[in-house]
């Protein structure tokens, strides 16, 4: 079925990335499935994470349906685009409805993107994660693709003015090997294992990042940056 909204939006994003001279580096793209359902579980450091992560999946010719807050769908400009791209609205007062919608999409062979932290991490460390990604993967019996992104927070993140004038920002994204969970898998244990995997992947991305983190607002204190500490971030 033709994607009347998603396809032109992707093409527009690609023009924007070219104009900003984004320096993409993708790792593990071979782990992205070319068919069948899958859960993309990613850390969250920027308002543009979904667009960058989707860019890395273009070669698979798959369209990731991201789960996003209901408030984004209520926006007069973003709302129609999000609905047209078949992203999934998450109403925190009725979370079960969005879970069921995502589950149906996965069982129909769609790729669903989710940020288990639920909100942007202002410390840029991976915070406590909710169990949605694990429960969806178990319920639909599809793999989880652990994913991490680094650098996108330098353009537009929570609590810091966006800067679309910044050019040639390195944005690194890694897609990990698929994680398959049995129907009777323990959700809590699987969630802990997923977080450990994502933290390890993120640290590796940060170690290979070409720009220094020292003294930078977009970098965590662990790396010498000046972002809020995890315990006090708003």
State each model region's role.
Residues 1-18, 23-34, 104-107, 166, ...:
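Membrane-interfacial terminal anchoring regions of lipid-handling membrane enzymes
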Residues 33-94:
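Catalytic core of membrane glycerolipid acyltransferases/transacylases, capturing the structured
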Residues 56, 81, 104, 135-139:
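Hydrophobic/aromatic ligand-binding patch that stacks against planar heteroaromatic rings
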Residues 87-93, 97-109:
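Helix-adjacent hinge/juxtasegments
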Residues 105-133:
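Catalytic-site beta-strand/loop segments enriched in glycine and acidic/polar residues
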Residues 124-186, 220-221, 228-229:
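A cross-family acyltransferase "interaction/gating" segment
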């Amino acid at each position: 079925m033709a994607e009347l909204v998603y396809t032109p939006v992707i093409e527009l994003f690609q023009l924007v990335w070219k104009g900003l001279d984004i320096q993409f580096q993708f790792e593990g793209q071979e782990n992205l499935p070319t068919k069948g359902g899958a859960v993309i579980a990613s850390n969250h450091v920027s308002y543009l994470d979904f667009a960058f992560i989707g860019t890395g999946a273009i070669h698979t010719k798959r369209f990731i349906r991201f789960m996003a807050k209901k408030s984004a769908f209520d926006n007069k400009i973003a709302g129609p685009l999000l609905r047209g791209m078949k992203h999934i609205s998450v109403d925190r007062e009725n979370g079960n409805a969005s879970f069921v919608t995502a589950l149906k999409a996965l069982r129909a062979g769609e790729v669903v993107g989710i940020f288990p932290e639920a909100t942007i991490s202002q410390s840029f460390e991976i915070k406590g994660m909710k169990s949605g990604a694990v429960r969806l993967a178990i319920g639909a019996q599809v793999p989880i693709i652990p994913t991490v992104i680094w650098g996108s927070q330098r353009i537009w993140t929570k609590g810091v003015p966006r800067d679309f004038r910044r050019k040639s920002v390195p944005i690194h994204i890694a897609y990990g090997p698929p994680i398959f969970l049995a129907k009777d898998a323990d959700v809590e244990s699987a969630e802990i294992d997923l977080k450990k995997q994502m933290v390890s992947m993120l640290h590796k991305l940060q170690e290979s990042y070409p720009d220094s983190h020292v003294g930078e607002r977009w970098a965590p204190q662990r790396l010498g940056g000046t972002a809020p500490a995890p315990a006090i971030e708003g």
